[in-house]
Amino acid sequence: MPISCKSRCGNRAALKRPKTGDALCKECFFAAFEAEIHHTISSSNLFRRGEKVAVAASGGKDSTVLAHVLKLLNERHDYGLDLVLLSIDEGITGYRDDSLETVKQNRDDYQMPLKILSYEELYGWTMDRIVAQIGRSNNCTFCGVFRRQALDRGAKLLGVDSIATGHNADDIAETVLMNILRGDTARLRRCTDIKTGGGEDSIPRVKPLKYSYEKEIVMYAHYKKLVYFSTECVFAPNAYRGHARAFLKDLEKVRPSVIMDIIYSGEQLRFKDTVKKPVRGICTRCGFVSSQQPCKACVLLEGLNRGLPKLGIGKKSKGDRMIAKQNQELALRERANLVKNDF
Amino acid sequence: MCSIGEDDFGDEGGTHAMVAGSVPSGIDLSPGECSKCDISSDELFQLNFRTPECRDCFLAYVRHKFRAALGAAKVLPRDAEVLLVVDGSAESLVLLDMLYYAQTQNTFKRLHCSARMVYLEDQPVQGRDPADLESLEALSKRYEAFEFYVITLGLPVGSLKLLKDYSPVAQESNELIQKLSQLRSLTSRQDYLQQQRKNLIASVAQKLHCSHVFNSSISVDLATQLLTSIALGRGGSAALDVALLDDRLAAGIKLLRPLKDLTEQEVQFYVHAQRLQPLLMASSRYGQELGDAASLQNLTSAFVANLQKNFSSTVSTVFRTGGKISESTHPEQAKCNHCQSALDVELSDTLLAIEYSRSVSEAGVRLNEAIEDPEIISKRRMKLNDELCHACSSIEADFKNGS
């Protein structure tokens, strides 16, 4: 017997919502999914009328759905937002070049301006060249650190009031688990925040999809026939996150509500007064947000430019020793040159 | 899609990676000279991160961990009455043996408290053979100084008996078993049973006039417990689930976990050094036989066991994370009727989001015609169960569906 839609709209149910277990028809699912995101945005006061918001767009399912839904809600509920797409080109052949084509498609479909910033122009390095230098291990460190800052740089360039990212509920639950697995209390504190940053000198980041299940995002994109790019990065996947992810997926199979429960748990965690809090400051070299001096991006870049790509990987003291050693060698060579010139 | 986020990078730099490495398990003792007291012995105890030592030096070290846990926090008042929960597992025997030793010391070093022990017979609930009375009696004989009580899980506290007066009665059913059978999921059953165990222990302690209860959880148990609590939505009270002192028991009784800093290897070595004999039936938890994927708890223990095998240092990181968190409460906050944890349901956006999802799913396309704002409906629903915490209301919801 066909199951009818839970909302009693008279249609047959087309899907079972992973989040609530309710059987819904397509139209009712769209309505519910969009209403939830609208509720998240309005109840958490993510945006204010007249603001310019950059949607961090990678071409993947999350950012595509985010761009689509934000545009739709902006018109439906008259948020009065000026939406722009912001993409980062890491310079990964066979991955980012293709996904950027998808973003360009989104730009045309949603009539939203698009700004693409590349690692090449910001740092003088593409990921392809970085990987050629450092190899397949630790390359994700460069990509991640640079991307975070690149988004800030892009946002500053575009003069936006906030950056909306496509982090979904699964991502957040996974991050809670991951931070517990490695005892990172600083990140555990803030990883469930729907809005981060936003002090005097930083641009806030918001996660309108915080309560949207990944499975529902995929369903939404599928039924709405949205164009998105779904290929894994050609470089190494992140084993650590993978571990937490696999665990979360197993948990979700047993009890789908576990994703929201973990987010709730993460929010309820309090820390002893003796636990150190990170201090957010500004990097003295580049002027972007950082909790250390100089910021990670500057250290990594210095390493690349000095020909010491491992500089920012591992302990700082190790990096300092590497610099000292290189300086010593350079000085020696300089002295040798002087001697030669005397003749 | 690249899933690397800013959270993947530590302040030390580099992606955090779980360092693969395993702890050798099993007991492999070789003869040699103790690196501490220079006396040669047949069996040297080589713990990870420690130099090989003789039996006496090893015992002094592990027993100190137990005393230090109690002493540093000053949680046990002088001459306290303590109830020791013995389940026959290696850990519980280690705790029993350590406590016994601490009491037989000379005046200067003696731990001043008087202790009783209780064995919770869970045979009817677990559906397995009753406890092996002979082993229990052997245990009682070895530690004669402690009174040994037995009670069956699910029976009223009035049925508490001294071991010598106890005879196992084959039980088909009791109230607890019936309750458990009404719960749909094993996750809820295990969670419910854990709360009921705690309640029963508290009643026994109260009956025996004990102000403190000793529980034998060790670090890996607490790492598992922390992740389980997080997965169940008990984040707010997770700190108490893994702390040395848990004061959520009825009548102000305090639950202590003095072995919380012990590792599995230390327990193994201690069992060997003292020739303890763990009871076989203690090896399985309720519902464990249904497989790893049967409940959140089973999955989490399997996950931690796997970590322990392949990334053993991660387990201690998880355990230490548990030591950094504290309970989210202030004194005047109401407590959950079921688990006594602080209630903070009303303030949570996440819980509102869950209810909101249900409301809008019901409304569907007719959302705009709805007479009442789904947010108001959601808030009203959240208030329906305002005497239970989020996790306990999940158990409650499971009941209704099952009956």
UniProtKB/Swiss-Prot annotation, chain A:
InterPro entries: CTU1-like_ATP-bd (IPR056369), CTU1_C (IPR032442), Ncs6/Tuc1/Ctu1 (IPR000541), Rossmann-like_a/b/a_fold (IPR014729), TilS/TtcA_N (IPR011063), tRNA_thiolation_TtcA_Ctu1 (IPR035107), UPF0021_CS (IPR020554). Keywords: Cytoplasm, RNA-binding, Transferase, tRNA processing, tRNA-binding. It comes from the Eukaryota. Pathway: tRNA modification; 5-methoxycarbonylmethyl-2-thiouridine-tRNA biosynthesis. Pfam families: ATP_bind_3, zn-ribbon_14. GO terms for cellular component: cytosol; cytosolic tRNA wobble base thiouridylase complex; mitochondrion. GO terms for biological process: protein urmylation; tRNA thio-modification; tRNA wobble position uridine thiolation; tRNA wobble uridine modification. Its main location: cytoplasm. Gene3D superfamilies: HUPs. This is Cytoplasmic tRNA 2-thiolation protein 1. It comes from Drosophila ananassae (Fruit fly).
Swiss-Prot record, chain B:
This is Cytoplasmic tRNA 2-thiolation protein 2. GO terms for molecular function: nucleotidyltransferase activity; sulfurtransferase activity; tRNA binding. One of its GO terms (biological process) is tRNA thio-modification. Gene3D superfamilies: HUPs (3.40.50.620). Pathway: tRNA modification; 5-methoxycarbonylmethyl-2-thiouridine-tRNA biosynthesis. It comes from Drosophila ananassae. Keywords: Cytoplasm, tRNA processing. The keyword tRNA processing applies.
